[in-house]
Amino acid sequence: MPKRPMYLQHVNIYVRNVERSKQWYEDLLGLHTYEFRPGWAAFMSADEEQSHEVALMQLGDDAPLQQKGQVGLNHMAWRLASLDDLKDLYRH
C-alpha cells in the first residue's frame, strides 16, 4: 500500500475573470495575494509565508481550443515525503 501524501500543496483553478475571482477569494476567505498578473493569473495563500496555495488562471480568448470555457479545477498538487513514495503511488 502506498504512503499517504503529507499535505495538499496547492490547487490550480481556471477562471473566466482573474480580477473578480481574486477579489472574491480575498474578501470571502481572507487570502493574501502573493503575485498578481492582471488578465492572466493570481497566486494566493492563507499563509503569507507561502508562495501560493491557490493559483487562479484566467482562460481568455487566446486560450487553447481544448481549454476554452472549461472553468474549474485544473489540478491539485500533493506533497509526498520522497520520490520513492511518489513512485509507489504511481505504480499503485
PLM region spans:
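Conserved short beta-strand elements that form part of the metal-binding/catalytic scaffold
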Residues: 32-70, 80
